[in-house]
Amino acid sequence: MAEPESEKPSSAQGGGLPSSDHPLNPILQRQIELPEIKINYFSLFRYATVKEYALLLISAFFAAVSGAMFPLLILFIGNLVQVLKDFNLGTIPQEQLSEQIRDIALYIVYLFLGQLVSVFIFTNGCLLVGEAITNAIREKYVRSLFRQNIAFFDTYGSGKITSQLTSSTATIQDAISHKIGLFVSACSCFVASYAIGFVKHWKLTFILTSTVVAITGVMIIMSGFMAKFGANSSGALAEASAKLEETFSGIRVVKALGLEKRLSDELDPQLLNIEFWGKRVRHVMGWMLAIMYGLIFLNYGLAIWQGYRFMQGGTEDVGAIITVLMCLNIGAFLFGNVGPHLQAMSLGAAAAQDIFAVIERESVTDGGAPPGSFEVEGNIEFRNVSHVYPSRPDTHVLQDFSMIFPAGKVTAIVGASGSGKSTIVSILERFYEPVSGQVFLDGHDITHLNVQWLRQQFGLVGQEPVLFNGSIFKNVAYGLKGTQYGQESREVTMKLVTEACRIANAHDFITALPHGYDQEVGIRGASLSGGQRQRIAIARAIVSGPKILLLDEATSALDVQSEEAVQLGLNMASSGRTTIVVAHSLSTIKLADNIIVMEKGRVAQQGTHAELEAQEGLYQTFVRRQQLKQATLEPPHARITPAVDTPASPQHRLSEKTGSIYGQGESEAADKSPSTKYSFVQLVKFVARFNKEDWRLMVTGIASAVISGAVWPAHSVFFAKAIVALSSPSPASLARGPNFWAAMYVMLAFVQIASQGVQGSAFAICAERLILRARRVAFKYLLRQDVEFFDDPLHSSGIMTSFVSSDVNALAGLSGVFLGTLFSATATVLGGLILSLAVGWKLTLVTMGTIPIIIVAGYVRLKLVGTLEKISRKVHEESAGRVCEEINAVRTVAASCLEDEMCEDYVRSLKSKEKTYLRATLWSSGWYALSEAVPLGCMSLGFWYGATLVMRTEYTTEQFFIVVTAVIFGASSAGLVFAFAPDFGKAGVSAERLQELVDRQPEVDTWSEEGDHIETTNGKVDVSNVVFYYNQRSKTPVLNSISLGAAPGQSIGLCGGSGSGKSTVASLLERFYNPSSGTVSLDEKDVRTININSYRAQFALVNQEPLLFSCSIRENLLYGSLGKDLTDSEIEEACKMAQVYDFVCSLPEGLDTSFGSNAVMLSGGQRQRLSIARAILRKPRVLILDEATSALDSTSERAVIEALTKTAEGRTTIMVAHRLSTIQGCDKIFYLRAGAVAEEGTHEELMAKRGSYYDSVNLQSLG
């Protein structure tokens, strides 16, 4: 559809744009630029509804209530300290002490119940709000994408879209769901602590505020760095995702060229760039937490030292001092835990930057004009139209083009590749805005018309047919969207669909399929042949009876019988309609009312077929070059045997051996009970292997984490000693008074900063290296898989891109912050347990009994989160994969006005998991609330029983506080580990999928060294009695006992109806698949006995739909070199042979010119010729051309055929073709029907037989 481009901007805003002083810059810039917007954390809530805001406020309220529980607990602890001091001094009797202890314990029980309820409500509410708002962002993003002009997508790749719909939105959701509740709870704790502190002792509270100011400053500074580094990391990930999506989309080309290792190596610098920025984010995070915890311990020292001074002045008692000390420090402690939450929030804001920029971008074609109010006649006028593409501002694709297309007439456009033919259609459809000139429809400037209404007046069939995953009926019915028939019943719609399919010559093959019109076509129509897809696309274009038909190589993928039948149908459909036909095959336009011959963006000739044929000029040359060598021809007659259509492309044949890495069975079953093939221990061992080389860093990190965790039991001792010292009648007389313990806290602070900082840095490096290696493994093992693996809809390019970029990233949940927290918490629990047992075993045994409850509750929640993560990720990846598929076909979506339909499909997929998500969230929140509330119950029990032991004089006050403090921090640490349950659950799911991928053994394994290694071959190819099923459960074979062959150096042609098995033979020869039975042999050796890599090195394949990669022309061509260094002269010679040399020389940077994803701004012919040049550089012994010249104009086709004929000397050549002029010079031609050879012979022999081949030649005659 599109015309040449030379360079691809690196983003939607840069790269290949003209310089700022270029006169066309504003016109081109506005077609692709993204608005510059400023995003902060609160911007993430801009799409929340009133209901969601209400639920968020309720959740925030209960989060605040939850946060206030600990300061209230400290208030009671302070009262208990004062009561115990009074009891020790003899100022209150034992009975009063017992009564006050009971009251305090009962109040703490109330706090336990309040915590249980409040945590459940805020957790559940935050998770639901986060899911709802993120889904709203996803929906807005997808709707905005489908609103954009087509030029925007030429620089904004589908890989980036996939990454943003999966990885980036997951980051946003993480920032606005549970994390916000935890953040509010921590802030509430902080505020409540200060409120109590100011009430109890405002002077001491004010002094201790200095430390909190320092903590806040550290958080602000460090968060700024994290946001900056996080944005760089997200940008690097988006670039890598684009490369991944491009690779998986062209997996057949990758396999045919043997590019697996090369592409892995090329991706590595981008993965290293992601690791570079990721490590910086985690380094900053680790040291921020270390400094914050160090400041907390300094605060303890300051409080003890200053509190003692106040006590010396007689201004306050020890209870108030301890209350202020513990309140401010527990507030600062929990506030210090917001570090990971702030990191998540800053990463969420960074991830939203590009997403919100797309959402807020106004398309240059989406002016919002009301639908047209006039009756369309179909008069079209181009007036002085000039056009350039943003990446080539110095090259005019159209130059001052003026032309009238009369209403009700058929106008054909022909010309060489890149002459501007398809650009005319693109501008008429408003895919691009011309840089000058105007286009009128019935006298109305089309830029003033509503773009959707305008496109509804057209029926467009593109050169490369695009179908969407769904039934045939649904695909054809898409053509009715937005028209007067769009809301009709299925019965009425079916009649319209059936009639359109009859005209498009598709009805017979559709009814022959197992499910008829309800047959699923698969991703991109994978279950149908190219010709079948083309006919369905034609039916979709004409089903609504549009006023104007735009046919851009509409019959290029059809066999000759189908082409003739469809052409007759199109002639019928064109009656009374304005029809514009872009064509290379001149046999399809002989009856046009006017034929325009384009050359370099200008009109070179125009007239009828007869007039132009009689004139000396380009058209006459085209006709002469397409003329077939013929015997005496007769008109086609009843002897013509229609092609028998069978599904001719793969639709996943999965068995246990070749199963999906996304599990077995139907999605509903998977939703109910996601299968787990591996135990937790197996997965941990598997993930640990990625950090095997980092064992020294791991040991350093673990040792530092143990020291960091052991600080808290030491803190318990220091704290108890300080309380005893402050409670003493004469603290100054003590050998180790309050000042000594204040100094010990200064020492403890520096130990904590050093140990936690080293821990954070060590695990930061380990986590990012783990992700780097896991991504490398994931990509390499995916490239190892055979083509059959990628035929599975669950392994689409979008889903696999998400797997490498997003899923694998989740493995950090088993490393980094989580690993540090796990070892630190373990050291705290074990250290506290040992200390407590040594100091007071009775109280320890009673209070420690609650920790197993925390662990069980956390474990159950972990399992629930894992289940929820599997369901949620499956839905999001599949829906993102569909969007990616649709964006790749955005021209078809836009031309058919399917934007709203595609958006609604996406929204329905998001809503499909709402009930499951709600149920899992309720259970998960309940168990999490229990794990958070149990420590308060533990404290209640501990204070009651411990105080009772003190009252009985079995324990001293020092023993009591050492044990209780150690147990409190032990229980809190145990609960803190399970706060990472969501991250841990994601990591578990990702580890399982990666393990399944690594364990999967492909049937055709490019890693295998087995088989004979061959340096060269004679090129003798044989297919003997081959039967082949794309689907193991299919009853109809695609190839049915077929036998054919080619002698060394011989050229053979394969022709026949769509679905007859031509391309399947090519796929078997390339060993994309193994035959179900029979033998494919090379030099009389079964190809399965030859090493796959050395086998494919003897072959070169040029596909019907050419694929080029996002790099320079030189790099694209060198992909065919088998790793050999080639000189420029060798490359240029290949370009000359492929008739693309002149075009390359016309580009600003020649061979070093880069272009966008799949070279979308090159014409189909230019892409095809570059693909042929790449094949020539491969110097193959066997050359496979699967419709290799289908996209070429007649001049280029004839030149390329001559070049291929020359290069084929001494090589075996297999040519698959619909256009018989391509294969008439072959040594032997095989005409296929229903997967078997119906006729064979030379062109002359087959013409003499007057069979199906003879009839096909008749149908393509230009005479």
From Swiss-Prot:
<dbReference type="InterPro" id="IPR017871">
    <property type="entry name" value="ABC_transporter-like_CS"/>
</dbReference>
<feature type="binding site">
    <location>
        <begin position="1056"/>
        <end position="1063"/>
    </location>
    <ligand>
        <name>ATP</name>
    </ligand>
</feature>
<dbReference type="GO" id="GO:0090374">
    <property type="term" value="P:oligopeptide export from mitochondrion"/>
</dbReference>
<feature type="transmembrane region" description="Helical">
    <location>
        <begin position="206"/>
        <end position="226"/>
    </location>
</feature>
<dbReference type="GO" id="GO:0005743">
    <property type="term" value="C:mitochondrial inner membrane"/>
</dbReference>
<comment type="similarity">
    <text>Belongs to the ABC transporter superfamily. ABCB family. Multidrug resistance exporter (TC 3.A.1.201) subfamily.</text>
</comment>
<feature type="domain" description="ABC transmembrane type-1 1">
    <location>
        <begin position="57"/>
        <end position="347"/>
    </location>
</feature>
<dbReference type="Pfam" id="PF00005">
    <property type="entry name" value="ABC_tran"/>
</dbReference>
<keyword id="KW-0843">Virulence</keyword>
<feature type="transmembrane region" description="Helical">
    <location>
        <begin position="740"/>
        <end position="760"/>
    </location>
</feature>
<keyword id="KW-0325">Glycoprotein</keyword>
<dbReference type="InterPro" id="IPR036640">
    <property type="entry name" value="ABC1_TM_sf"/>
</dbReference>
<dbReference type="GO" id="GO:0008559">
    <property type="term" value="F:ABC-type xenobiotic transporter activity"/>
</dbReference>
<dbReference type="GO" id="GO:0016887">
    <property type="term" value="F:ATP hydrolysis activity"/>
</dbReference>
<protein>
    <recommendedName>
        <fullName>Multidrug resistance protein sirA</fullName>
        <ecNumber>7.6.2.2</ecNumber>
    </recommendedName>
</protein>
<keyword id="KW-0067">ATP-binding</keyword>
<feature type="region of interest" description="Disordered">
    <location>
        <begin position="1"/>
        <end position="21"/>
    </location>
</feature>
<feature type="transmembrane region" description="Helical">
    <location>
        <begin position="318"/>
        <end position="338"/>
    </location>
</feature>
<feature type="transmembrane region" description="Helical">
    <location>
        <begin position="104"/>
        <end position="124"/>
    </location>
</feature>
<dbReference type="InterPro" id="IPR003593">
    <property type="entry name" value="AAA+_ATPase"/>
</dbReference>
<dbReference type="InterPro" id="IPR027417">
    <property type="entry name" value="P-loop_NTPase"/>
</dbReference>
<feature type="domain" description="ABC transporter 1">
    <location>
        <begin position="380"/>
        <end position="625"/>
    </location>
</feature>
<feature type="glycosylation site" description="N-linked (GlcNAc...) asparagine">
    <location>
        <position position="469"/>
    </location>
</feature>
<feature type="transmembrane region" description="Helical">
    <location>
        <begin position="930"/>
        <end position="950"/>
    </location>
</feature>
<feature type="glycosylation site" description="N-linked (GlcNAc...) asparagine">
    <location>
        <position position="232"/>
    </location>
</feature>
<keyword id="KW-1003">Cell membrane</keyword>
<feature type="glycosylation site" description="N-linked (GlcNAc...) asparagine">
    <location>
        <position position="384"/>
    </location>
</feature>
<dbReference type="GO" id="GO:0005524">
    <property type="term" value="F:ATP binding"/>
</dbReference>
<feature type="transmembrane region" description="Helical">
    <location>
        <begin position="817"/>
        <end position="839"/>
    </location>
</feature>
<feature type="domain" description="ABC transmembrane type-1 2">
    <location>
        <begin position="699"/>
        <end position="986"/>
    </location>
</feature>
<keyword id="KW-0677">Repeat</keyword>
<keyword id="KW-0547">Nucleotide-binding</keyword>
<dbReference type="InterPro" id="IPR003439">
    <property type="entry name" value="ABC_transporter-like_ATP-bd"/>
</dbReference>
<feature type="domain" description="ABC transporter 2">
    <location>
        <begin position="1021"/>
        <end position="1259"/>
    </location>
</feature>
<comment type="function">
    <text>Sirodesmin transporter that provides the dual role of sirodesmin export and self-protection. Also provides tolerance to gliotoxin.</text>
</comment>
<feature type="transmembrane region" description="Helical">
    <location>
        <begin position="699"/>
        <end position="719"/>
    </location>
</feature>
<dbReference type="GO" id="GO:0005886">
    <property type="term" value="C:plasma membrane"/>
</dbReference>
<dbReference type="GO" id="GO:0015421">
    <property type="term" value="F:ABC-type oligopeptide transporter activity"/>
</dbReference>
<keyword id="KW-1278">Translocase</keyword>
<feature type="transmembrane region" description="Helical">
    <location>
        <begin position="179"/>
        <end position="199"/>
    </location>
</feature>
<keyword id="KW-0813">Transport</keyword>
<feature type="transmembrane region" description="Helical">
    <location>
        <begin position="284"/>
        <end position="304"/>
    </location>
</feature>
